[in-house]
């Protein structure tokens, strides 16, 4: 939005005034192997007196944003992703040919053994609306609220505020905290404590940066700073 843009540009001006050169990129979590369509603007800066020739004015040079990416967005968009399938509770299907399985919801559910995860039973149970849940096709994420994920596709952004509800691909319920953590590509050993409220668990997960994205950017920063020595 215009308000967010104004805040962002003011933040950059403050960094320039404090003696930093910066680089920025609109990055999608899919590029780093996380199974969710999540765009974020990333900004990285270093004090100018540490950069030598690695800058041009306020622009930081030589930062290889793509170094640890697994995919390009153009490649991702070109795969033959399935669209929608009639919801069938408990159904079992195979990954379609030509689809990168490691970018799919089902792959990460299995990878993180979500059925046996400490947060497996942490999900909101609706007071009503079960019939409505059953009417939504697998993969129908076109609505503002009730979005049913497709097991052989990536997820929309893992964020559940503003009445956004994500449904399990082949179960009559919302996603569990264990499943949401898996879509954030966290190690399967990572769990949220029992004394957190369900609301705070999902808020914490939604506010997080996908693990594979943050790991890739952290390695890029490490390599860049090592190159300045």
Spans of features found by a protein language model:
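C-terminal target-recognition/interaction regions appended to catalytic cores
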Residues: 98-229
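Class I S-adenosyl-L-methionine
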Residues: 1-143
């Amino acid at each position: 939005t215009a308000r967010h843009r104004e805040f962002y540009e003011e933040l950059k001006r403050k960094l320039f005034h404090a003696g930093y050169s910066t680089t920025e990129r609109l990055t999608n979590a899919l590029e780093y192997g996380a199974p969710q369509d999540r765009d974020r603007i990333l900004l990285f800066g270093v004090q100018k007196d540490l950069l030598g020739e690695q800058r041009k004015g306020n622009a930081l040079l030589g930062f290889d944003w793509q170094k640890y990416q697994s995919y390009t967005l153009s490649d991702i968009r070109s795969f033959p992703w399935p669209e929608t399938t009639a919801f069938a509770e408990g159904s079992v299907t195979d990954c379609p040919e030509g689809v990168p399985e490691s970018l799919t919801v089902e792959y990460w559910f299995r990878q993180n053994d979500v059925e046996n995860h400490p947060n497996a039973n942490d999900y909101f149970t609706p007071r009503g609306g079960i019939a409505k849940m059953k009417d939504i096709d697998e993969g129908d994420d076109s609505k503002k609220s009730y979005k049913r994920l497709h097991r052989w596709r990536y997820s929309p952004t893992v964020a559940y505020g503003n009445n956004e509800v994500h449904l399990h691909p082949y179960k009559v319920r919302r996603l569990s905290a264990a499943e949401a953590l898996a879509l954030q590509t966290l190690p399967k050993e990572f769990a949220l404590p029992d004394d957190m409220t369900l609301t705070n668990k999902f808020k914490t997960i939604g506010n997080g940066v996908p693990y594979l994205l943050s790991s890739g950017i952290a390695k890029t920063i490490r390599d860049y700073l090592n190159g300045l020595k």
